[in-house]
């Protein structure tokens, strides 16, 4: 099983308005960590940057504007993915894994692919993700008060 655990830091909470400034995680294949990554990236030049989001991440506008350009980081990221997945094979994809990714991170990551002129996000990743927040629901149901 091919898993891509990941987390993003963004310039706000709206994927259509804000951008990514950090992409971190690990590639796990059949239970073995193959690679870790921590990409700092300049947000899309059109992205709005909110003070609240920068405070959460502990960075400044000046810092994120000094990060490597979006296109170059996108290329590094997809080069890494291509070491483990053949994007032309419909049966060879990663499961995206993380916390609250179905409601937040996946939208930003997909938008980032489009911003880099790549409409083939689904060639890399299965449409269903492994979201720890969603999985925890079944465990927490009998524990939490009704």
Regions found by a protein language model. Name each.
Residues 119-132:
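Short, acidic/small-residue loops that bind anionic groups at enzyme active sites
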Residues 129-145:
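Short alpha-helix plus adjacent loop in nuclease-associated cores
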Residues 113-117:
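Short, surface-exposed basic-aromatic patches at helix termini and helix-loop junctions that form
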Residues 1-112, 123:
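Conserved non-catalytic scaffold segment of RNase H-like nuclease domains
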